[in-house]
Amino acid sequence: MTPDTEVRDERADAIRRGMTLLLTRITGRQQAAAYPELRELIDNAGGRYFAGYDNPPGNEVRVSFNAFEVNQTLTRLNMPIWGEERPATLLWLAADFGNGERAELMADDRAPPLRAGVVAGVPSQPLSDEAAELFDEITREILRAADERGLPLVLPELDAEDRMYVRFADVWGAFDPVVERAAERYDVEAILIARVVGTELGTEVNWTVRRGERRETLTTPLARMGIDWLADEFAAQYTTIGGARLTWVTIRGIRSWTDWRVVDVLSSLSIVESAVPDSIVGDDLVLRVAARGDDDQLARLLTLDGRLLRVDSEPGLVFTPAWRTDVESSEPP
């Protein structure tokens, strides 16, 4: 975070702004500071919630907070909490500024300076200074928004393997199946395609989100609005409100001591307070789980990283370890 040199107490201001950013990430709400309930945390950010302040070389400062204290207060205030488990999204961004000036965002562009104007395999004019500056501004705004919202973005390598499937025209033409094929190597939950049109009148971004069979589109004048849109969608699914409740989770296919590590899988989830073996019937392990949120949210998190697969043919929360291929299972819808 960059400190504001115009304020009298830069350190205190940085701590307050750090808490505001943290609350935006944790609650999943864009304007967290506008909620009266959250003023308690912002006003006391330098008190019992404060954990550390680091001022490394450069223009950035790092502020850390006590996660337990923050989460306890949010639970007491009945505010939403979005834990550490966050779906990764592949961002495929293509920009056309006219007159043959085209650019795509690639993985190497996370580190400045951005290599604008590189469109592998496509005849393209080098970007003018004006177009390069605009491309830089747009991409930085998108990456900054993703960081502020806590949305993990994966950028394509745009290497020979990617180019086997996807060309600039495929992204620009919204040929989703082609992009989806290329995205298989990246192991992501969603694909976010951004088509940026830059003209003398301004910038327009056409967004397409693919999540399984779902496809949604949005057109925005501001680059970050697509990121906020997707973050809001994820937050609605993954945030939990209130304290923990008891539920039962069945793990099918427990046949060795190695399989018992599924208990650690459950216990590691941010919404789970405890996961205790309740009974064993055959190779079915039933766990008594205290977790925030409802069963659907718990199921989404349990299958998010691919270690557990849901058994859809059974009612309730029934899963099997992904390393067990001899048990009927399928990915959740």
Give the location of each predicted region.
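C-terminal soluble interaction/assembly domains
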Residues: 211-213, 219-220, 225, 234-333
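Extracytoplasmic/secreted envelope proteins and their assembly/folding machinery
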Residues: 12-23, 35, 39, 71-76, ...
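Amphipathic beta-strand/beta-sheet edge segments enriched in Tyr/Trp
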Residues: 3, 67-69, 182-227, 299, ...
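A short, hydrophobic beta-strand-centered structural micro-motif
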Residues: 44-55, 91-95, 154-157, 170-202, ...
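Pro/Ala/Gly-rich low-complexity, hydrophilic intrinsically disordered segments
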Residues: 60-95, 104-111, 213-248, 324-333
